[in-house]
Amino acid sequence: FRGQNILGYRPYADDVVDYFVQKSISNGIDIIRIFDCLNDLRNLQEAVNATNKFKAQEGRGEAQVALAYTLGDAYSLEYWTGMAKKIEEMGADSICIKDMAGLLVPYKAAELIKAMKEVTKLPIQLHTHYTSGVASMTYLKAVEAGVDVIDTAMSPFAMGTSQPATEV
């Protein structure tokens, strides 16, 4: 969900975020994937804290911080590895590289995964879309580089703007 914005497009109070996370975990959602479209970790801290609080109470729940992958001069390996370190420090259980536009290409994925694995012990999950037609190869290179989890979709729902097919 969208951190302080939960599932909407405006910020909510900390107690509302806390209650949303509590209800999510108590109703069976184990992985709380939290992101901010601008990768502003301040907007994610309350959700991470809430997940960790209810994980301690319920015995389950994982705070997964998702980084919105994008291109540009500002988004160097140093940027991504710095974010990985901060995510680990803030108490997250795992990291998801969320490539919602399908911009991540195979060899860049391998480079990114290797670099992030060098700076964090957290599991890394990769989520990409087939929009540019290279997602399957991106996943292959990410797996070779040591990514822990990849997101896929069943073939009737896969490809196009979705994820690569699970069966392929």
Predicted regions and their residues:
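Catalytic cores and adjacent flexible loops of soluble metabolic enzymes
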Residues: F1-V168
